[in-house]
Amino acid sequence: MFTSAHANRSPLTSASVRRPSHSVVEHSATGLISEIVYREDQPMMTQLLLLPLLQQLGQQSRWQLWLTPQQKLSKEWVQSSGLPLSKVMQINQMSPCNTLESMIRALRTGNYNVVIGWLTDELTEQEHERLALAAEEGHPMGFIMRPVRNTSQPGRQLSGLKIHSNLYH
């Protein structure tokens, strides 16, 4: 699993984000769009990376939105994963085009601390810019989940992980 070259860009810092309706602590890592490319035959790797973050974000007052193509989150899985059932929303059976537009709208609202969307194709620079601007406006974290394609691309890393975060530096 790896993140894309344009992942983890955040134009905001914790000092520059202040809203009366949410505490600064809730916005310490906001306005972030990351792309997680994963292997479908190894779902545990993705869960090991994302679940601790999602559990921590679940303690905040805002919702978590999952835009899934076909899978439906089970109530049992959400609870056993330590996620707050009362703060997890899911919209499933969306086409990739609708997923991107729905992500942009959801990121802008400020109602969610995280928006997770599954896409099959890489984003264009323009699509990524639209997502980044929406995240800057609404202050959530956005995760684009994309499965690895079997065709190898020359010069591109096919496994590994890069994490860039101003939380740890």
From Swiss-Prot:
- Fetch the Pfam families from UniProt: SulA
Q: Positions of the site: Essential for degradation by Lon protease?
A: H169
Region of interest called Lon protease binding, as start-end residue ranges on this chain: 162-169
Biological process annotations from GO: division septum assembly; DNA repair; negative regulation of cell division; SOS response
Q: Where is the composition biased (Polar residues)?
A: 1-16
Keywords associated with the record: Cell cycle, Cell division, DNA damage, Septation, SOS response
Describe how expression is induced or repressed: By DNA damage, as part of the SOS response.
Record keywords: Lipid metabolism included? no
Give the region (FtsZ binding) as residue ranges: 106-112
Work out whether the entry's keyword set contains Isomerase. no
Which residues lie within the region annotated Disordered?
Answer: 1-20
Family annotation (InterPro entries):
Cell_div_suppressor_SulA (IPR004596), P-loop_NTPase (IPR027417), SulA_CellDiv_inhibitor (IPR050356), SulA_enterobact (IPR047696)
State the post-translational modifications.
Is rapidly cleaved and degraded by the Lon protease once DNA damage is repaired.
For this protein, the record's SUPFAM superfamilies field holds: P-loop containing nucleoside triphosphate hydrolases
Summarize subunit and interaction data from the UniProt record for this chain: Interacts with FtsZ.
The record's annotation in PANTHER family points to: BLR3025 PROTEIN-RELATED (PTHR35369), CELL DIVISION INHIBITOR SULA (PTHR35369:SF4)
Described purpose of this protein according to its UniProt entry = Component of the SOS system and an inhibitor of cell division. Accumulation of SulA causes rapid cessation of cell division and the appearance of long, non-septate filaments. In the presence of GTP, binds a polymerization-competent form of FtsZ in a 1:1 ratio, thus inhibiting FtsZ polymerization and therefore preventing it from participating in the assembly of the Z ring. This mechanism prevents the premature segregation of damaged DNA to daughter cells during cell division.
Q: Which family does it belong to?
A: Belongs to the SulA family.
UniProt-listed HAMAP family: SulA
In Swiss-Prot or TrEMBL terms, this protein is called Cell division inhibitor SulA
Lineage of the native species?
A: Bacteria, Pseudomonadati, Pseudomonadota, Gammaproteobacteria, Enterobacterales
